[in-house]
């Protein structure tokens, strides 16, 4: 049991980290992408360096919107040099859209761990922006309720959001997280599964699914979910080692 408790503790941070993960989500883009005036990404690298020093500076996002489209950032993320790829991942986090998800998911497998870390943050930011501006605002309020442990209020509000926006995957994920914290593991499993149906790239929901099965002592199902997690986001700290531990636990009851 001690080993299993440590296993759960290790991965709790990933799913809980979905509340306010990374920087505050940028607003949904409501304009046509502008042609880029910086094909090599030189301005992008400058903005990235400034972002590292001042991550909350609003003008950086505005500059990204002015000079780049999500499609151009995706190309730079795929073929740029090291610093350009890091910068492009940050840029997608700030202005990326639904079509950016595959590019960011690929970047989670980048040989540079900093690119992977930036892509992970960008994933959470893009997922929140997949709702309308109103839906994003409502979800941020739910996240705040979860943060202060007003869990019943969080469930009530996010359930209303799901009724009006049933295709908004991150709303399902946030309700799953809330159910998990309320120890309603079956309900959390159902919502994690729905999140993955809507967004098969959602490594947070895959990890949450594994944690729920662990709490219910359903070790084979937990292993399957963690194996999915590592396929989606292989650089999560200690994931491979913990999969090996869980495999051993299944073989030796």
Located regions from the model:
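Register position in tetratricopeptide repeats
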Residues: 94, 125-129, 147, 181, ...
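Extended repeat-based scaffolds of very large eukaryotic assembly and lipid-transport proteins
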Residues: 22-98, 102, 106-148
């Amino acid at each position: 049991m001690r080993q299993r408790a440590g296993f759960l503790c290790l991965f709790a941070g990933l799913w809980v980290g979905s509340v306010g993960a990374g920087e505050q989500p940028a607003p949904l883009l409501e304009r046509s992408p502008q042609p880029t005036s910086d094909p090599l990404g030189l301005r992008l690298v400058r903005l990235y360096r400034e972002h590292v020093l001042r991550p909350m500076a609003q003008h950086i996002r505005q500059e990204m919107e002015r000079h780049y489209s999500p499609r151009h950032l995706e190309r730079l993320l795929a073929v740029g040099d090291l610093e350009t790829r890091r910068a492009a991942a940050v840029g997608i986090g700030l202005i990326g859209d639904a079509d950016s998800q595959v590019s960011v998911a690929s970047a989670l497998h980048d040989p540079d761990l900093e690119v992977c870390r930036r892509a992970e943050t960008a994933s959470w930011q893009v997922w929140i922006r997949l709702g309308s501006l109103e839906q994003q605002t409502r979800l941020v309020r739910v996240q705040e309720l979860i943060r202060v442990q007003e869990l019943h209020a969080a469930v009530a509000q996010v359930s209303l959001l799901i009724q009006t926006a049933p295709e908004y995957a991150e709303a399902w994920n946030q309700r799953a997280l809330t159910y998990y914290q309320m120890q309603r593991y079956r309900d959390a499993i159902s919502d994690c599964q729905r999140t993955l149906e809507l967004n098969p790239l959602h490594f947070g929901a895959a990890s949450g699914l594994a944690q729920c099965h662990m709490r219910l002592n359903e070790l084979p199902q937990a292993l399957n979910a963690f194996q999915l997690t590592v396929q989606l986001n292989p650089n999560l700290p200690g994931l491979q080692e913990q999969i090996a531990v869980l495999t051993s636990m299944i073989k030796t009851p």
